[in-house]
């Protein structure tokens, strides 16, 4: 029986790898500290183009690893002229990817004014600027809505976007991801596709999406989309990230 179980486990592992493709990068958040070879911080409280209310910091008060999860913690406190603090981590300058299956297992906060996100920006943002660099929002959730939203942003003689929400109880752990190749970007929730964006042959000026992108994880407070927190919003509140993984899709190449 034990031998059978070992063989079965090996078969399941092989099948999973065949389905996902080759794992090219991951952070399982099993170390005691946040990896400096995987993540850097955006720091400050300039609104980030969205009228956000928080000041992002690199303090352990706002981001840390605990019990195998990355915790991004939004707090209500006076800090550098702002009334809230949180964290925004990114792989910019360390890890960039073109194409692949990119996913994270996460549980995010629900509350008026809360705006957790798992997303990507083009590596060339410093020179091309937004939206010409491209943006892939793998997962966004706002306030008390019972859905997650996947969106792509790019430049086509001005900012354009395409996306779709899908029902989701974000207060529970789910796997959010995209499958991205030269033809399309497919948004996935727990392995099920709910939206697809066509980028084949740079259709509709989507050439941005054939360039390297970096990953971002953040928990914003307030902003033009979710609105401000109110008396019902509970602080501190936490975004939990179990892992982030990047696979090479079968039959396609993922460049770093």
Task: Provide a role label for each language-model segment.
Residues 19-256:
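GH16 jelly-roll
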Residues 14-18:
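Sec/Tat signal peptide C-region and signal peptidase I cleavage site
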Residues 4-13:
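Sec-dependent N-terminal signal peptides
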